[in-house]
Design a protein with these regions (language model features):
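Periplasmic c-type cytochrome electron-transfer domains
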Residues: 1-11, 20-51, 55-58, 62-299
């Protein structure tokens, strides 16, 4: 958008399956923009989550000078998801791209120069990582950040906002009501700030709904398909609860508990059953009964 003329200059399309854009930032020089979003594999049946079968978590790089999408890379690794990326920022020295991974309560720190160098080589057909399989498959390669990214556990719950002052990195826990500070490779200072949402069933349910660590390898949370307070991702998914081969649009969960039966075909008798089935068959998780009870309270 041209802010002086209040005019749209160009629309840039993210890859097919992109949803839930959460943050955009630029580097210090204004040459590139970085966008966090999810990348759904909605053409596949929902029978597993291994290696990002259903959802992957992405960073798209935009060439601002030429007004085009340069590349999309996955923040995930082959064995571990980086669910629900939220804020992205570039360090003041222009050396790092930092991403708040809200679903797994971590911060991903990427060497910016090495990332751009790796992408330039990959575009020329150079096998830049052991998993490289051609430029057209970069956005499907969970190994693209191998060796150039650090994943730092924060300690708080729901890391949605980050900031940097010099070499000091700050990360805010939305649900835990705290700020964590890292002056190196470890977040070792915690400061309580504001309200801890985990004191109530509704607050805990909200946190569980956004918590990918409940599920297998942290690839996705309930909020991956139902972002923005349990609404819809706008995609068609083929769930197995009513057979294969009949993809249907994701439903908003607003008032689902008050309007049984649930799912498009009414295959679930009520929302309580649907919540527990989702934990088992979409997150591929086994959780204490209190987790589903708290999710019910939130929804």
């Amino acid at each position: 958008i041209d802010t002086e003329k209040s005019k749209v200059i160009k629309r840039l399309l993210l890859p097919n399956g992109s949803t839930d854009v959460k943050s955009v930032t630029t580097d210090v020089t204004g040459e590139h923009a970085y966008v966090t979003h999810l990348l759904a594999r909605y053409q596949l049946p929902t029978n597993q989550v291994d290696r990002g079968w259903m959802y992957t978590n992405a960073l798209t790089i935009v060439d601002l000078k030429n007004e085009k999408v340069e590349a999309t890379v996955l923040l995930d690794t082959p064995q571990k998801g980086a669910a629900n990326p939220w804020q992205v920022m570039v360090s003041p020295d222009n050396k790092e791209i930092c991403v708040a991974l809200s679903g797994v309560h971590e911060v991903c720190r990427i060497d910016r120069a090495k990332l751009h160098d790796r992408l330039a080589q990959a575009k020329q057909g150079v096998a830049v990582t052991p998993s490289y399989n051609g430029w057209e498959n970069v956005m499907n390669d969970a190994g693209m950040l191998y060796g150039i990214a650090q994943y730092q556990p924060v300690g708080g719950k729901g890391i949605r906002a980050i900031a940097m002052n010099g070499k000091t990195l700050y990360a805010a826990g939305y649900f835990s009501g705290d700020i964590h500070v890292a002056k190196g490779d470890v977040f070792d200072v915690q400061r309580k700030l504001g309200n801890n949402m985990l004191a109530s069933a509704e607050g805990r349910g909200n946190m569980y709904f956004h918590d990918a660590t409940l599920g297998f390898q942290g690839w996705q949370s309930c909020a991956s398909c139902h972002p923005n307070d349990a609404r819809a991702d706008g995609l068609n998914w083929d769930l197995l609860n009513d057979g294969l081969g009949n993809p249907k649009n994701t439903k908003s969960l607003l008032l689902s508990h008050q309007t049984p039966p649930c799912m498009v075909t009414g295959i679930r008798a009520n929302a309580e059953i649907a919540v527990r089935s989702g934990i088992k068959y979409i997150l591929f998780a086994v959780t204490p009964p209190s987790v589903a009870d708290d999710m019910d309270a939130y929804l």
